[in-house]
Amino acid sequence: MSNYKLLTPGPLTTTKTVKQEMLKDRCTWDDDYKNVTQVIRKQLLNLAQVDEPHYTAVLMQGSGSFVVESVLTTAVGEDDKLLIITNGAYGERIVEMAKVLRLALVVYSVPYDKQPSSLEVQALLEKDASITHVAVVHCETTTGILNPIKEIGEVVYSFNKTFIVDAMSSFGGVPMDLSDLHIDFCISSANKCIQGVPGFGFVIAKTNILEKCKGQARSVALDLYSQWEVMKKDGKWRFTSPTHVVAAFAKALEELVEEGGVNARYQRYADNNLLLRSRLSVLGFEAYISEELQSPIITTYLFPHKEFSFEHFYQEMKKAGFVIYPGKLTDVDTFRIGNIGDIYEEDMQALCEVIENYMVVKNNEN
């Protein structure tokens, strides 16, 4: 299988050195391995610009969705009510999880190309005093829109509610101070902006809030409190952990620091995104999200014309060494291009040249 450049929001292109960390086998009970887990937990707090004992980090096996569900099942009690803010498929997935868990919920939904309003969140909290928790996706990779978690967080905090943020595709790539943002549970995954590989996610939680969650989970494997209770002692996971993935993630964290930290990575991602948007605009590709609402993570593009075949376009990009993403909208034809991972200006320039040549050939055919 060819080694493609993955222009996706994760899994993504990783460095050779991150991959090499997975060549060694490790024992889950070994003290050296458990220490790796503890170091990772501390480094995650550093990235979030918070520290112990006010905050704590918990690693959880599975994809990002597993970790989101672990927070919902653990943090939202039987007598609580959850307000879920949605403007994309991943917010809607949180709604689906909440319904399966039979949580009391309120849904505030806005169109996919619009940001939710903090004023509307305020109105909803004023109207329904029984709401105890508020959940929102930071970077909604359905479209690439970046939601205003600072403004929403200030409202949630003013009402003394618990704030849950799905920062799956932003944490580590967009600067975040969890305390300043009033986030109580921040959720992300190994295979996103920190540039590890799939296999586990993590939660950075306010310690005093997590401590109140004992016995609330409706799941054994996804009980975030119980996972934390065991892990905080010496780095042991309750159940078998993805040892190779953990080792790769530890290396990815080292490389994030070497790059200059989150601010430097954010700038690289933003530069990649600006280059992509400017060059594709000249070629007639219109972005679905306006520039001021666009995240530096992934961009959704409208098909340039009715005859455009995404399948053919996708295969031609793949032949040239690039893998892109299909669209996730139901009402309009789109595709997506990510620019995170081990991707640099020269990669984006090369991609744009391939797209330009493709469009020239197709235009000549017509």
From Swiss-Prot:
Keyword Transferase (UniProt): yes
Modified residues (N6-(pyridoxal phosphate)lysine): K192
Enzyme class: transferase
Any single GO BP term: organic phosphonate catabolic process
UniProt keyword Transferase present: yes
Signal sequence residues: none
Catalysis performed (reactions): (2-aminoethyl)phosphonate + pyruvate = phosphonoacetaldehyde + L-alanine
Molecular functions per Gene Ontology: 2-aminoethylphosphonate-pyruvate transaminase activity
Keyword vocabulary terms for this entry: Aminotransferase, Pyridoxal phosphate, Pyruvate, Transferase
Cofactor: pyridoxal 5'-phosphate
A family per Pfam: Aminotran_5
EC number: 2.6.1.37
Disulfide bonds: none
The family this protein is said to belong to: Belongs to the class-V pyridoxal-phosphate-dependent aminotransferase family. PhnW subfamily.
Subunit architecture: Homodimer.
Role of this protein: Involved in phosphonate degradation.
Stored HAMAP family: PhnW_aminotrans_5 (MF_01376)
UniProt-recorded name of the protein: 2-aminoethylphosphonate--pyruvate transaminase
Lineage: Bacteria, Bacillati, Bacillota, Bacilli, Bacillales
